[in-house]
């Protein structure tokens, strides 16, 4: 989860988020090198006497500044396309959870179970217990097994919403009349917080998401107690 005054990304909890963080560092390094080169050239122009001001044609230079940006764009595009493919690929999910956005709460349905469904509302500030997080706690958490691929089907009952959990690298739009899907895989147990990430009305800020990732045995016990 996020911490006060945090400047970086949240700690990665899923393979997808780890790949996204690596891609972020890779792209940022390229941007830093390009910025350094541009600043160096500008400093040279400002501190040295200008030469070749009347040059009308320089094919060698034009070739370089055409090919070099193309190579840089390819170096950025290839890992990006790889991650996009990984995010869309779902191989044999062990569980499917249907998520519906409402104004202003989420509802969840475990489609592999006959009667396992519930609504998830934010806990008001006045009802919080010591140690709980303001605007992030819910009355019903989404309990899921860790280290297993889980398919999330995401849609909306009314307006546009967006189901997002940053530490898992998840952000999927909830669109009325359309079913989007995302893959959830957690490397370790814990509580992972998210929020609606699409402006959806006056209480948009009061639609938190809480995933509780537990070992498979604990999940089986929880699901048996809920049915």
From Swiss-Prot:
Cu cation A2 binds at residues 196, 198, 200, 204. CDD domains: CcO_II_C. Its main location: mitochondrion. Mg(2+) binds at residue 198. Cu cation A1 binds at residues 161, 196, 200, 207. It is an enzyme of class 7 (translocase). Coiled coil: none annotated. Component of the cytochrome c oxidase, the last enzyme in the mitochondrial electron transport chain which drives oxidative phosphorylation. The respiratory chain contains 3 multisubunit complexes succinate dehydrogenase (complex II, CII), ubiquinol-cytochrome c oxidoreductase (cytochrome b-c1 complex, complex III, CIII) and cytochrome c oxidase (complex IV, CIV), that cooperate to transfer electrons derived from NADH and succinate to molecular oxygen, creating an electrochemical gradient over the inner membrane that drives transmembrane transport and the ATP synthase. Component of the cytochrome c oxidase (complex IV, CIV), a multisubunit enzyme composed of 14 subunits. The complex is composed of a catalytic core of 3 subunits MT-CO1, MT-CO2 and MT-CO3, encoded in the mitochondrial DNA, and 11 supernumerary subunits COX4I, COX5A, COX5B, COX6A, COX6B, COX6C, COX7A, COX7B, COX7C, COX8 and NDUFA4, which are encoded in the nuclear genome. This is Cytochrome c oxidase subunit 2. It comes from Maxomys bartelsii (Bartels's Javan maxomys).
């Amino acid at each position: 989860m996020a911490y006060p005054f945090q400047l970086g990304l949240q700690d990665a909890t899923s393979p997808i988020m780890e790949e996204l963080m690596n891609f972020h560092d890779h792209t940022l390094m390229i941007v830093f090198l390009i910025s350094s080169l541009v600043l160096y050239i500008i400093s040279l122009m400002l501190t040295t006497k200008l030469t070749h001001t009347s040059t009308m044609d320089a094919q060698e230079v034009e070739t370089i500044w055409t090919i070099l940006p193309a190579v840089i764009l390819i170096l950025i595009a290839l890992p990006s396309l790889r991650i996009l493919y990984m995010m869309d690929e779902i191989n044999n999910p062990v569980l499917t959870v249907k998520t519906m956005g409402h104004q202003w709460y989420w509802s969840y349905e475990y489609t592999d179970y006959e009667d396992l469904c519930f609504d998830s509302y934010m806990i008001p500030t006045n009802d919080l217990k010591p140690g709980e997080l303001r605007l992030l706690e819910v009355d019903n958490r989404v309990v899921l097994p860790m280290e297993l691929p889980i398919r999330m089907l995401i849609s909306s009952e009314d307006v546009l919403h967006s189901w997002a959990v940053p530490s898992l690298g998840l952000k999927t739009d909830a669109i009325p009349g359309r079913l989007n899907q995302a893959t959830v895989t957690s490397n370790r147990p814990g509580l992972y917080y998210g929020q609606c990430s699409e402006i959806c009305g006056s209480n948009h800020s009061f639609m938190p998401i809480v995933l509780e990732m537990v070992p498979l045995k604990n999940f089986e016990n929880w699901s048996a107690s809920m049915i």
